[in-house]
Design a protein with these regions (language model features):
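Conserved small/polar residues in nucleotide/adenosyl-binding loops
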Residues: 1-5
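Non-catalytic, conformational "gating/processing" segments within enzyme and secreted inhibitor domains
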Residues: 41-202, 207, 222-310
Length: 345
C-alpha cells in the first residue's frame, strides 16, 4: 500500500536512477512502470502542483546529500536534478550533516517535521536521498459550531475508552469494500480530499491492513458510491515513523537491501571499492485535523551504504475506533499522505 504514496515514490524514484540489472527490474515491477515512465510521471505530477489551489497549499521537495569522498556518477545526479528538481549538497557527513539535513526537512515541511536524522552516520554511509511533502488545506464545507460534538468516546486499539471531540457532517461519497466502509470529504476546490476507512466491527485495523494493497485502495476510491453519508471524524493529531525495508521487501524489492546483490553502480563508487546497497528507508509523517481543515507533512530518506558482501440509502460512518486515513489527490488518484489512528492519546 505504500508504493503509491508520493513522498515514498519520489525518494525511491531517485534511488532507481542509480540502480541496474535485477535491482532495477524489481523496483520497476513494484512501481508498475519502467524507470523512464516513473521519472516522467513524477516530474509531470510535481510540475502540475499549483503554488496555491483555492485554500490548499501543496509542495514537494527533493534533495541529495553526498559524502564528499563518494565518487558519484554525473548521470545519476543529472537525473535527480532534471526529473526531481533535487538540491544537491556535499558534506563531510559529520555532525553538521545532522543539523543541515534536519533544517532542510523542517523548512520544506513548514516545521511540522523537524528531524529525520538523529545522529551523524557511520563511515559506510555514502548518500541520503530525501523527499519532503507538505499540505495545508481548508474544508470545502466549513464546520459550524453546532457540528462539533464534544466529549464523545473513542475505543482505542488497546480496548481503552478515550474521550474525543467529533466533527459531524453530511457527505456524498461513500466507500465500501471487503470488511471496510468509509467516505471521502473534499477540501476547498475539490482537487484534494480526506479519505477515511473504518474496518467492520469484529475486524481489527491490524488484520485489515495485512491484506490491503495499493490496487485495492485504488479500486475502493474509484468505485465509490454517491449516497447520504452521516460522517463523524474525531479531532486528532497523528505522527508516525516507519522503517520501510520490510514492506518494500514484501513487494519484491529484495536485492536493493542485500549488500551482496544490490546493483547501484550507476549511482557511483565508494572510496573503499565496496558494493553499494540501501540500509534504510525511513518515512515520517505528521497530520493534524480539526474543524478548519488539515495540515500534514511527510519526509522520506533513503540511506545508501557501502559494504563488503553480506447504495442510495443513508449511510453512517463514525470513526470511533481505529481507522485508516489518507489525503488524496482526486484528479490523479494519488495518496499524498497516509496513516492510521489507533488512539486519541
Amino acid at each position: 500500500m505504500y508504493k503509491r504514496q508520493v513522498s515514498i515514490l519520489n525518494a525511491l524514484g531517485m534511488t532507481a536512477n542509480g540502480a541496474g540489472g535485477t535491482t532495477l527490474k524489481q523496483m520497476e515491477t513494484a512501481a508498475g512502470m519502467s524507470l523512464n515512465q516513473l521519472n516522467e510521471f513524477l516530474y509531470t505530477y510535481r510540475m502540475s502542483l499549483p503554488a496555491a489551489y483555492k485554500n490548499c497549499a501543496v509542495s514537494l521537495a527533493n534533495s541529495a546529500w553526498v559524502r564528499d569522498t563518494f565518487r558519484v556518477e554525473d548521470s545519476f545526479l543529472r537525473a535527480c536534478v532534471n526529473y526531481y528538481s533535487a538540491e544537491v549538497y556535499r558534506s563531510a557527513f559529520d555532525g553538521s550533516l545532522v543539523t543541515d539535513l534536519n533544517r532542510w526537512v523542517g523548512k520544506e515541511t513548514n516545521g511540522l517535521i523537524d528531524s529525520l536524522l538523529e545522529q551523524a552516520p557511520g563511515e559506510a554511509t555514502m548518500l541520503y536521498l530525501v523527499n519532503a511533502a507538505c499540505f495545508d488545506a481548508r474544508w470545502e464545507t466549513p464546520y459550524e459550531a453546532s457540528d462539533i460534538r464534544e466529549g464523545g468516546t473513542f475505543t482505542a486499539a488497546s480496548g481503552a475508552r478515550q474521550t474525543a471531540d467529533y466533527l459531524t457532517s453530511s457527505e456524498s461519497i461513500y466507500l465500501s469494500g471487503n470488511n471496510v466502509t468509509g467516505f471521502l470529504k473534499p477540501y476547498d476546490g475539490g482537487k484534494y480530499a480526506f479519505v477515511a476507512l473504518l474496518p467492520d466491527e469484529g475486524v481489527t485495523l491490524e488484520d485489515y491492513l495485512k491484506n490491503l494493497t495499493g490496487e485495492h485502495l485504488y479500486q475502493l476510491i474509484t468505485g465509490h458510491q454517491y449516497a447520504d453519508v452521516q460522517a463523524s471524524i474525531p479531532r486528532f493529531t497523528a505522527q508516525t515513523e516507519l522503517e520501510l525495508e520490510k514492506a518494500l521487501t514484501a513487494m519484491g524489492i529484495t536485492d536493493l537491501f542485500d549488500v551482496s546483490r544490490a546493483d547501484l553502480r550507476a549511482m557511483g563508487s565508494a572510496p573503499s571499492g565496496n558494493n553499494l546497497y540501501v540500509s534504510s528507508v525511513l518515512h515520517k509523517t505528521y497530520l493534524s485535523l480539526d474543524e478548519n481543515g488539515t495540515r500534514a507533512a511527510a519526509a522520506t530518506s533513503v540511506q545508501v551504504n557501502s559494504g563488503s558482501a553480506q447504495p442510495t440509502d443513508v449511510k453512517t460512518v463514525t470513526l470511533d475506533r481505529p481507522f485508516l486515513y489518507m489525503v488524496v489527490d482526486t484528479h490523479a488518484c494519488v495518496p499524498l499522505f497516509m496513516g492510521t489512528v489507533t488512539s486519541m492519546e
